[in-house]
Regions:
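Feature marks short, highly hydrophobic, charge-poor N-terminal signal-anchor/signal peptide-like helices
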Residues: 1-11
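Hydrophobic membrane-insertion alpha-helices, especially the h-region
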Residues: 9-20
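Structured extramembrane domains adjacent to transmembrane segments
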Residues: 58-211
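Extended, charged low-complexity segments
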Residues: 217-253
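N-terminal topogenic membrane-targeting module
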Residues: 21-86
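Short intrinsically disordered, low-complexity coil segments enriched in acidic
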Residues: 12, 190-193, 225-232
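Terminus-proximal functional modules
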Residues: 24-40, 185-190, 201-216, 221-222, ...
Length: 253
């Protein structure tokens, strides 16, 4: 009983911080640009470690038939958040892929993360995306965009094979829509904010026209923070890994 009373205050503070204070902070400080702008950059303009990582990725994807569109950077996508990425497209299969290195500075410890995502648009208006992000989405799923996460598929060749198999199984016989030449930067900008626009239709974000940014509603802020908070976040990550393994097995991997 003494043990319980010792730890009870810490538990209550944790619950208060994660489920009450965090949504309020996110509600009033978080934003997504409504029209994000991406700056093209040469590989020599990237930080050396980022350039090395993205360069290896481009070389690996060249072997799969992808061609490089370019390297891009967005150093102020959200408050204290920016990223670098390499964008490629497949001239035959009409697939696109990007490798992203994201960084965030919360004022205490700089945070870095990276993931790869393959995307295919179809003539019926749907989109299938396959990535290896280690974090489950905090957004509401919608039928127009099917996003599959395989956090243990860190080999880009394996991830692309999974993506191709998913496209064949989920959209058999439906033609792919290629990324138009000269529209790559627009496609990148629109694709970045497309899901946020959809979330706004669900009531999780609203457009702040003065700042030209999307901001979370209180409902959206609660959804974002609660789905990441412990122990919910840990359970969702565990379930995501389990589902990913089951899907890979069903696809023959």
């Amino acid at each position: 009983m003494d043990f319980l009373w010792t730890w009870l205050p810490f538990l209550l503070v944790s619950i208060l911080a994660q489920f009450i204070l965090a949504p309020i902070i996110v509600r009033f400080t978080s934003s997504h640009p409504a029209c994000p702008e991406f700056e093209a950059a040469g590989i020599g303009q990237l930080p050396p470690d980022v350039a090395a990582n993205l360069g290896r990725f481009v070389y690996a994807m060249n072997a799969e038939g992808f061609v490089l569109v370019g390297y891009f950077r967005q150093l102020a996508y959200m408050r204290n958040v920016g990223f670098y990425l390499a964008l490629l497209k497949h001239p035959v299969h009409a697939d696109t892929v990007y490798a992203m290195e994201m960084f965030a500075n919360n004022g205490i410890v700089p945070v870095r993360s990276a993931h790869v995502e393959f995307c295919t648009d179809f003539t019926d208006g749907k989109e299938i995306c396959t990535n290896n992000s280690k974090q489950p989405s905090v957004h509401k799923a919608h039928p127009g965009m099917r996003v599959h996460r395989f956090p243990e598929a860190q080999n880009p060749h394996l991830l692309y094979a999974i993506h191709r198999r998913l496209c064949a199984n989920l959209a058999p016989g439906v033609a792919h829509v290629p990324m138009a030449d000269g529209m790559e930067v627009f496609h990148l900008s629109y694709g970045t904010v497309k899901d946020v626009r959809k979330q706004a239709e669900f009531g999780y974000y609203y457009l702040d026209e003065k700042g030209n940014v999307f901001r979370p509603t209180l409902k959206g802020a609660c959804r974002i923070t609660w789905r990441l908070a412990w122990p919910i976040g840990a359970m969702r990550r565990s379930r995501m890994r389990k589902n990913a393994r089951a899907t890979m097995l069903s696809l023959g991997f």
